[in-house]
Curated annotation (Swiss-Prot):
SMART domains: RHOD (SM00450). This is tRNA uridine(34) hydroxylase. The active site is at C184. Residues 130-224 form the Rhodanese domain. GO terms for biological process: tRNA modification. The gene is trhO.
Length: 327
């Protein structure tokens, strides 16, 4: 039996005239049919994840396919029991994924319609994973990798996508002369980043067409060689990919035990995404460090209406005090 909610993940690099007005009109339509989700619109295209009941999502797909240049836009569809979003946002941005090349003095931005890596099918990508002479690079953020990743893939030490070009330049000697294939959640980041690799002089660059989401749904590979879960930017947080031999790779921030539950650090000025159990979240006041645990704006403390005495008691249980610097 089909589940009542569909989640649509999609993007398309396509020139959009008067993109700011397009975003406003798009938001009005989405609200008129009761759709929920998050969509970014830029002069270079559109990138979104939305959710709704079957009829609602069908209306939306029909609407998008009626727009100029979007007739062949590819929707990746998941069925879920509950909505993946609480509200509807459509925002105009400079880029639909922020690689930030111009911000970081990496010359001009990349247009994936002109320069991008070769598309690899799930089977071709699986073959690349098994090839010892191929470098497989995860283009996502560190916390996404830590929840789940392809077996043997390189983990760049980055907290956001715009840090990736500098990381690659810092490690250029390690794989400049090798075949490099990249992957991301749904493909939108790889379209642009693989193009940047080509411009940097890498001779053999490939990308997983349709991203991890498509790999997990492919009837031939069935998500094999993916370890852990896939981080998604909605209420679901994590979804399954490997339907052959799934394992847990996530580790609890505090004690290193297997964990696939993400929370944001209680300190709003840190907001680091950390994997932790409910027990350790309570034990460590959802703070990723002592400084965050004792921060006066710690959201865990306020959300649970903890008194100062209760905070002191929990800190003492882990050998800490209210001092900013732990003993």
């Amino acid at each position: 039996m089909a589940k009542p909610i569909r989640v649509l993940l999609y993007y398309k690099y396509v020139p959009i005239e008067n993109a700011e007005q397009f975003a406003a009109d798009h938001l009005a339509f989405c609200k008129s049919i009761g759709l929920k989700g998050r969509i970014l619109v830029a002069d270079e295209g559109i990138n979104g994840t939305v959710s709704g009941e079957y009829e609602t999502t069908q209306k939306y797909m029909d609407y998008v396919h009626s727009l100029p240049g979007m007739e062949d836009l590819w929707f990746k569809i998941d069925e879920e029991e509950e909505q993946a979003f609480k509200k509807m946002f459509v925002r105009y941005k400079k880029e639909i994924v922020h690689l930030g090349l111009e911000d970081n003095n990496f010359d001009s931005d990349i247009n994936p319609l002109e320069t991008t890596g070769a598309y690899l099918s799930p089977k071709e990508f699986k073959d690349a994973l098994l090839d010892e002479d191929t470098v497989v690079l995860d283009t996502r953020n560190d916390y996404e990798y830590d929840l789940g990743h392809f077996r043997g893939a390189i983990r760049p030490d980055i907290r956001n996508f715009r840090e990736l070009p500098q990381w690659v330049r810092d490690h250029k000697e390690e794989f400049m002369d090798k075949r490099v294939v990249v992957y991301c959640t749904g493909g939108v980041r790889c379209e642009k980043f693989s193009g940047w690799l080509v411009r940097e002089g890498y001779k053999d660059v490939g990308q997983l067409h349709g991203g991890i989401v498509t790999y997990g749904k492919d009837p031939e590979v069935q998500g094999e060689l993916w370890d852990g879960k896939l981080y998604v930017f909605d209420e679901r947080i994590a979804v399954d990919v490997n339907h052959v031999d799934p394992i847990v790779v996530g580790k609890d921030w505090f004690d290193g035990t297997p964990c696939e539950r993400y929370v944001n650090c209680g300190n709003p000025f840190c907001n680091r995404r950390i994997l932790t159990s409910e027990e350790n979240e309570d034990k460590y006041l959802r703070g990723c460090s002592h400084e965050c645990r004792v921060h006066p704006r710690n959201r865990y403390v306020s959300e649970n209406d903890l008194s100062q005495e209760e905070v002191v008691e929990r800190l003492a249980a882990i050998g800490e005090s209210l001092d900013v610097t732990p003993a």
